[in-house]
Amino acid sequence: MFKIYNIKSRIIRENMNNKLFDKTIEHVIKYLNENIFFEKYTRISGLLQNIESRIKIISLVIFLVGSVLSKHILTLIIFNSIALILAYLSNIPLLQYLKRVYVFIPIFAGIIAIPVMFNFMTPGKDVFVILNNPHISITYEGLIYAITFTLRVATCVSFAVLIPITTQWNKVTSAIHKLGVPEVVITITNLAYRYIFLLLNFVLDMMYSRKSRVVNKLGMVESWKEAGKAIGALFIKTYQMGEDXYYAMLSRGYNGEIKHIYREEIKIKDIAFLLFSIIITALLVLFDRGIL
């Protein structure tokens, strides 16, 4: 195993000329490392780790819904601060947590919101004039809307991420089963979660194999052809893996229902945390609407 790893490492060092390939490899490896990294925080002692799983999911969803209902930047900042405080009290390194929350999805949301800032999408007071004839500018109303939208997405992600970081996956599936989520949804989600790692390793193996057999840099058309072949091979492998997994489950007595073992009990501290989330969310939403 170590010999194969050393060969792969040597191939990467000698042939890392294609920047797109480099970035793809790096992204996949980081994805795997981040998931392994966050898994260990489900087993440490912290605020959210000690909350019963059903209560935790319901409470974080309540915070998330409150963030969606909020329309003002100040309210969203307060919700975001609550998420950071919960992460800190759960002994999660804030730097890693912020990277997880803000690196991709909020940036993507901000890019989507860019057109809304212009006067032809959101008329209003000009903040920055780009062209006079035709008149194209960034308006104050559009800028506020874009910031609010991006911050709302970031806040929702910050609460959603806390669930898998602080809860073991088997407890998540058992908890949502207790909450009445259909068994089919749980089964599909469970299989997807468990086999995504195998598929990512298969993608890595394909990339290593392709790189070890390429001498010269491929042109754009050749790269597209190779990418198409890789996607086709991945699809076939995924289909075969799904069939094998299904027949293996049938051979072991699977009848469409998975047995869930749930041993957690609701305690006073769990009820207190649920009441805290309800009261804080209600107060912030009322404050956002100008009622308080």
From Swiss-Prot:
One of its GO terms (biological process) is cobalt ion transport. The keyword Membrane applies. Its main location: membrane. GO terms for cellular component: ATP-binding cassette (ABC) transporter complex. InterPro entries: ABC/ECF_trnsptr_transmembrane, ECF_CbiQ, ECF_transporter_component. CDD domains: EcfT. Keywords: Cell membrane, Membrane, Transmembrane, Transmembrane helix. It holds the Pfam family CbiQ. It is a multi-pass membrane protein. Belongs to the CbiQ family. NCBIfam families: ECF_T_CbiQ. This is Uncharacterized protein MJ1571. It comes from Methanocaldococcus jannaschii (strain ATCC 43067 / DSM 2661 / JAL-1 / JCM 10045 / NBRC 100440) (Methanococcus jannaschii).
